[in-house]
Amino acid sequence: MSTMTPAEIVSELDKHIIGQAKAKKAVAVALRNRWRRQQVAEPLRQEITPKNILMIGPTGVGKTEIARRLAKLADAPFIKIEATKFTEVGYVGRDVDSIVRDLIEISVKQTREAEMRKVRSKATDQAEDRILDILLPQPRAVGFGGNAEHANDDNNATRQTFRKRLREGQLDDKEVELDLEQPSVGMDIMAPPGMEEMTEQIRSMFSNLGSGKKQRRKVKIKEALKLLTDEEAAKMLNEEEVKTKAVQNVEQNGIVFLDEIDKITSRNNEGSGGEVSRQGVQRDLLPLVEGTTVNTKYGMVKTDHILFIASGAFHLAKPSDLIPELQGRFPIRVELDSLSVEDFEAILDATDASLVKQYQALLATEDVQLEFAADGIRRLAEIAFAVNEKTENIGARRLYTVIEKLLEEVSFSAGNHAGERVTIDAKYVDRALGEVAQDEDLSRYVL
C-alpha cells in the first residue's frame, strides 16, 4: 500500500496531468485514507468505510488518465473497467461479480511477485548452483585420504572461479541443457452468463493436467539463469499464504475504477427495452458498492472496504439519473473542467512525457532534430481548441490528431532528412494545418 501523503500524490499526478486540481485532491485524500484506516485500532477500523468518488467531466479532460496514474502510485490491487461491459443477470454479457474475480487475479499476481522478490537472492544462488553442477559435474571419488581432499579443494576453487565468471556475464552466450518444469497450458472456454465460476474451475482443472512434467531444453546461460531463478523462487513460495494475503489485500486496499457510468443511466426519452437492462446493471452494482461477499476460486472476498471511483461525461444524462441508492454510494462528487488553450499548451510541453518530447524522441532515432518554437506550440494549442469548439469536443485527444497531421510529411520523409533540424513555428503550423482548421467541413473529417 502507498504511504505517500496527499500533497505527494498530487505532485506526482501533476507531472502527467494538467489542471483538474479538485479531482486530484479527491483521489489523493481517498488513497491516503486507506493508509490512515490501517493505523486505526479494531473494532473501529471495521466501521470506517471508504468514501466512493464520482468524477464528472467531458471526454478527454483527464478522468481516465488520473485513474491510470493512480494505479501506479497506489501499490494496491487496482482494476479499471467499463460499466457498459456489464449487463443485468439473465442478459447476455458479463456479470458484475466478475469485477471482483478479475481484481483478485490481479492481487494474486501482485502478491506472488512481491513474495518472489523477497526470496530472489536465495533463489539466484540456488539457480547458480544448478548451472555450475551442469558445467562442472562433481568428480568421482578416486584414491584415498589426501588425494581426495586435494581434488575436492581444486574443484571448489574451479567452482568459485566459474561462479565469478557467471556473475560477471562472461558465460552468458554459452549453451546448456536443462530439465525445466513445463508451464501450465491455459485454455479459453466460452462462459455462459452467470456461470463464470464453474468455467474458471474447469479452466483450472485443465491447466493442472500438464503441470509437474519436466521438459529438456537447450538455452543460453543468461536465459537459463532467469528460468531457474523463477523455478527455485516458485518452490520457496507457500501458495496458500499467497492466496490468503492476496484476498486480504483486495479486501483492505482494493480500488475499482468504473468508467463510462453515465452510459448505464436511465433516460426518460428512451424506450423501455434498454432501460430495464441499464437499471438492472445499476441494481447489480449496488450490493457490490455497498458491501457484499463474492465467491471466487481463491475464497470468499468481502467488498465492504474496496474503494470505487466512478466517472462519466454525463453529456446526455445527469448524475441524478442514476438510481437513488447508487447515487448515495458515491458521496464525493468532483467536476472536471473543460480544457482551455493554456491547458493544451501545457499538455503539449509541460508534462514529463509530453507529446512534443515523444515526437522529438521518435524522430531523433532517424537523426532528425525536431524543435518546437513557443509560438508554434501556442498555435497548435489554439487550433486544437478551435476544432474542439467547432466540432465534437474530445478534449486533449484532439492534440493527437492535430500533431499527427502536422508532422505527417516530416515523419514520412525522415530518412531523407538525416542530420537536419526541423523547426516547428507558427508559420509552419499555419502552412500545414491552416486550411484544414479553417474549413469546418474538412476539419470535421481530417482533424
From Swiss-Prot:
Its main location: cytoplasm. Signal peptide: none annotated. One of its GO terms (cellular component) is HslUV protease complex. SUPFAM superfamilies: P-loop containing nucleoside triphosphate hydrolases. It is found in: Cytoplasm. GO terms for biological process: protein unfolding; proteolysis involved in protein catabolic process. The keyword ATP-binding applies. One of its GO terms (molecular function) is ATP binding. Keywords: ATP-binding, Chaperone, Cytoplasm, Nucleotide-binding, Stress response. It comes from the Bacteria. ATP binds at I18, G60, V61, G62, K63, T64, E65, D259, E325, R397. InterPro entries: AAA+_ATPase, ATP-dep_Clp_protease_ClpX, ATPase_AAA_core, Clp_ATPase_C, HslU, P-loop_NTPase. ATPase subunit of a proteasome-like degradation complex; this subunit has chaperone activity. The binding of ATP and its subsequent hydrolysis by HslU are essential for unfolding of protein substrates subsequently hydrolyzed by HslV. HslU recognizes the N-terminal part of its protein substrates and unfolds these before they are guided to HslV for hydrolysis. HAMAP family: HslU (MF_00249). A double ring-shaped homohexamer of HslV is capped on each side by a ring-shaped HslU homohexamer. The assembly of the HslU/HslV complex is dependent on binding of ATP. NCBIfam families: hslU (TIGR00390), PRK05201.1 (NF003544). Belongs to the ClpX chaperone family. HslU subfamily. This is ATP-dependent protease ATPase subunit HslU. It comes from Burkholderia cenocepacia (strain HI2424).
